[in-house]
């Protein structure tokens, strides 16, 4: 059976106050139950090498980041954080893990495995067709972004990831980096 997920990403929470801003935003928007997150930052003494973390959470993302042993503690400077909410379904643990794995697998191929902090599945292929649609929202205005910054982690994750399994059990990955408006 095909799986289709619409993920609304809210961000980007930037700079030194990113975690505090995220914590306040989550408190003021309890209707947004965010189960996914994207982080971009730098390890200690790193000047140019950017590292990424993609993960899932059942609790608030800010609480998840405070957990002992979380990858965010490896980042000395956090450039940005995005949190993702499922808009078309109430996901169970398997659905959240499926989307997380597909995003990690795709991002690993884009930025390179050494730059990914979470490497639980850098080579993953689900057994069924899976479609992930991403929409990017400004967390302060709750309006959809027309464009995101050139260096944003939102540029790495495409608006559409379509994973197809053919009748011959061959895996095919289709993406659309950014959808464009057709009607105004």
Predicted region positions:
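Boundary/linker segments flanking structured domains
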Residues: 1-51, 58-184
């Amino acid at each position: 059976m095909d799986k289709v997920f619409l993920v609304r990403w809210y961000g980007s929470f930037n700079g030194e106050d990113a975690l505090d801003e995220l914590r306040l935003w989550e408190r003021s928007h309890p209707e947004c139950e965010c189960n996914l997150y994207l982080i971009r930052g730098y390890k200690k003494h790193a000047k140019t090498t950017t590292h990424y973390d993609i993960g899932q959470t059942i609790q608030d993302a800010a609480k998840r980041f405070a957990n002992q042993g979380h990858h965010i503690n490896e980042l000395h400077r956090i450039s940005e954080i995005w949190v993702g909410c499922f808009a078309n379904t109430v996901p169970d643990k398997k659905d959240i893990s499926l989307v997380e794995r597909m995003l990690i697998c795709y991002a690993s191929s884009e930025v390179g495995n050494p730059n990914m902090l979470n490497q639980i599945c850098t080579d993953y292929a689900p057994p069924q067709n899976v479609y992930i649609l991403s929409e990017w929202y400004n967390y302060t205005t709750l309006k959809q972004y027309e464009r995101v910054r050139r260096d944003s982690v939102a540029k790495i994750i495409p608006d559409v990831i379509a994973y197809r399994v053919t009748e011959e059990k061959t895996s095919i990955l289709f993406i659309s980096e950014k959808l464009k408006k057709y009607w105004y």
